[in-house]
Amino acid sequence: VWVSGELSSFKEGEDFYWFGTNTATRDRNFVIYSYPYTAYDTFTKEYFTHKRDSVMRVNIPGAREGMYMETDTLMTKVKGLNVQGQYALEARGLWRVKADMMGGPFVSHARVDTVNNRVVVAEVFVYSPDTRKRDLIRQMEASLYTLRLPGEKATQANDSIK
């Protein structure tokens, strides 16, 4: 996967990686995490948001106890799409921090790593109060399409991105 060099902060958790700019404005973030693939219902909105919320609660806590990132389920849409010739669930919506006034847009791609029988989720989200976020999230979203799972070949265009 290609991640912008501007994302200079890094955190590692259990089956979880976060890269971000860690700034108060125009904050851009990329996360990738995985969990066992057990059934097709993994690709429903309900399962996806439940799993996303549990992973983010552990790995992206708020400033105080009881604060954590969660999905605004009313403002989140999911759909299937084809990425690298394989099915992917795309989730596009809003996140917020429980018990705080933070939030913003996110885009996630969930795919099955058939070699390791795991669901791999790559996600981008931004926090940029009082500014338009469309261009920020679109720039970040492009990195989701550069993810190559085990057994997938990189395309020519992406071979030059290192």
What is each PLM-predicted segment?
Residues 60-116, 131, 145:
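Signature of long, low-cysteine stretches enriched in small and polar/charged residues
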